[in-house]
Amino acid sequence: MRHYEVMVILDPDLEERSVSPLIENFLSVVRDGGGKVEKVDTWGRRRLSYEIKKKPEGIYSVIDLQAEPAVVKELDRQMNLNESVLRTKVLRPEMH
């Protein structure tokens, strides 16, 4: 298994209480695929440096996880299909 960091920018029109269940729904893909979620850090509503889908701000969330590459690819695909997700970025952080 490899370590990944996933950044998700969600639609700012979402209610605060619906953000966590939405992210948990995505993370079920990782858990079902045998991966493990180490940390979920929701930063809240932040201003974007440029508009994405005509939205000037978004709800940022950073997820640290360990999973196989195919599982992370499926997670990214599921997120991109959801209309509440403005942008995703999957990174493999450097080990120090």
Swiss-Prot record:
One of its GO terms (molecular function) is structural constituent of ribosome. Keywords: Ribonucleoprotein, Ribosomal protein, RNA-binding, rRNA-binding. The keyword Ribonucleoprotein applies. GO terms for biological process: translation. GO terms for cellular component: cytoplasm; ribonucleoprotein complex; ribosome. It comes from the Bacteria. HAMAP family: Ribosomal_bS6. Binds together with bS18 to 16S ribosomal RNA. NCBIfam families: S6. This is Small ribosomal subunit protein bS6. It comes from Streptomyces coelicolor (strain ATCC BAA-471 / A3(2) / M145).
